[in-house]
Structures are given as C-alpha cells and as structure tokens.
Amino acid sequence: MKLQRRDALRIMAACMADWWLPRQLFAQRISARKKPERRVIVVTFGGGVRYEDTMAPQGWVNIPHLASELVPQGLVYPVARHEGLTGHFNSTGALVTGTRQNVDAYGSEAPVTATIFEQFRKEHALPPEEAWVIATNKSFGLMGGSKLRAFGDPYSANVLLPKQLLIKTIKSAVSTNSGPGVEDRRALAERMMLALDEGYEGFGWRVFESERTLVPELRASLAKSLLDYFNDPAAPTSGDELTFFMTKEIMNRFAPSLLVVNFWDIDIAHYGAFSLYLDAVRRTDRLVHELWQHVQSLPAYRDRTTLMVVPEMGRDSDVAGNGFANHRSGDESCRRVWLVALGAGVPKGAGTERPIRTMDVAPTVAQILGFKMVECEGRPLPELVF
C-alpha cells in the first residue's frame, strides 16, 4: 500500500520522539538575560526578485499583502540598489555586514568583515540566543559570523537551516530500531528527501557549519518544533514554510532581539518556469505578512519591533541579461531592488525616492539596537526613528 505523505510524517514523529526529546530537557529553561528594549527582524526575498515583478505597479499583483497591507503601515524605499557580487552568499553577506563581500559563492567562507550579530552581542554582552539567522538557503551556515580574531564564533549568531535540521533528524530517526520495518523506513526516508529537495540546490552545494553548535536546550526546542511540524494537519509543503514555522518557534521560546530570516523558494526561477517563480514570490509575500501578524501577537515584540523586508538582489532583465531565471549578469535589473520598513520608529504611509543601498540595512540595525559598526560602507537610514 502506498504511504501517504501525512501518514509518513506521523510515523516519523513517533520514531523521533524518544530519540530527540529526553524528558528532562523539557524542564530546562534558559536563564533570563537583560534584553534591549527594541527588536529588529530583517526578512529577505532570498533568491532575488526583479523590481518589475514586485514593487513596480504591474508587479503589485504578485505581492498583494505587501502592496495593500504592509506598505500603508510603514515606509517604502522603491529605489534601492545592491552593489557588489550578485550571488546569494555575497549579497546577503553585504546586507548583514554593511560592506561588499567577495568570498566563495557556495558558502565555504565566512564574511570577511564583522556581522551585525557579532557586533551586537559583543557590545551588549549578550548570549547566542539573542541573535539568529534562520535560512532556507543551505549555503548560509557561516552567515552568522566572521572569522575576525576580535569577533567570530564566540559572538556569532545562532544559524538554523531548517531543511538541513529536518533531513538530519529524519536520517537519524530511520536509522534506529524502533518504528516501521527497515525497508519501510528506507523508503520513507527517500520520499522525505525528495519532498525536501526544493529550490536550486544541485551539485556543488554543501552545508558548511560554524564551529559553535547549539546547546542541548536549544536543540530540544527545535526538536519540539519539528514534532509539531510532523503532526500539524496543515503541514508545510515548502522549504520557506518550514523556515517560517521554525522562525515562529524561536520567537515564541526565546524572543531574540535580532533575527534575519532568509526565504529562498524564489530561487526555483533557475529552472526556467516563470509560473513557479511567481508562485514563490506570492508565497514569500504571504509568509512576510503572516510573520508580521505573529509579531503583533507576541507581547515581547508588539510595539517594539522594526521589520525590514528587502530582496537580497534582483534578477536578470529580459533585454540586457539572461531573463528572470538568472542573476549573474550584473545588469541594472540584478541590482535594482526595494526596501519596506514598518513597526517601531517607522513613519506610517510614507515613501521616499531617495536612493539607498542594501548595505545601509546593517548600520540602520546598529542604530536601532544601539551598537557601533567597526567597519561599514553603508549609512543608517535617516527616515527611521532611532
């Protein structure tokens, strides 16, 4: 009999429970630390989107929540630009450091300048739970910190790659003696691997992890979220939905002051199907809206959180580049993006044609959370109230 996906998920949950969740870990709590009053969440339309497909008037149909619900609540910068290499790791690296990056495109090298996470944690003497990168892109394992001697792993962010954590969990669960027969478990693992193999992650993509690993309490928390994922009647069906699910879990349990969330389903555009690209854009728009709703539902975040939404880069134009499917030509369409800010300190219903750069995000975060950037090309956005 063919195993249905939802039944498979429930079987996996049963296999995982004892392995992932020792009972005593439920009783443990991370000790309370003094937190900054403000919170910042940066969300990227990872993979890159073209201005014409999103923030241009003809693209509003693809971002209905941003265009009609979130932009009126905040401030939009329609003229933003990504400067530097138009690959995923380097473009997001520039976003979190405020400086152009030129490291391995597949994530084997950390940023060469200090990230906002390191500088935030070091200046305020904060624990790792206060800064997170949650990314669908599996090459972002080293995005949480640089290798600078004065910073690095002791001050890095926790980096969570939800798809990879789930894959490891599945592999470990099916290797145990409990649960269904060995052949059934192998077949189930193969089905789950296929279900999770979304986005443009072919040969050459590897996971490079930081030297610092999650403490047991954090691992237990994430395992609980995975079990919820398996048992949810509306179980997520894409990498970005899983990333969103895990982001909510981190917010609920630890209320970190600084979060960078990388949605990346949009990079399916590399397969050349415009309809799949637009579906991913609309899904990202929906998830951003749902994330903002979740912010409003939590006392730790409501009225004290600034949300910034920005594409990590654009994509090629049809004329000067290789079309929506790529982002390596470096043409203007690859660089023209936008930024939407809302929440604490952001004027409502505003907009400015003043050109900005994605590198301006990092020093803006620094101003909001009250720390200094030691090296930065970007400039804080003066329209926001610090």
Predicted regions and their residues:
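Active-site His/acidic residue clusters
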Residues: 51, 57, 145-147, 220-231, ...
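Substrate-binding rim/cap in mid-to-C-terminal beta-strand-loop elements of soluble/periplasmic
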Residues: 90-98, 328-369
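A contiguous, mid-domain pocket- or channel-lining segment that forms the substrate-recognition surface
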Residues: 106-219, 239
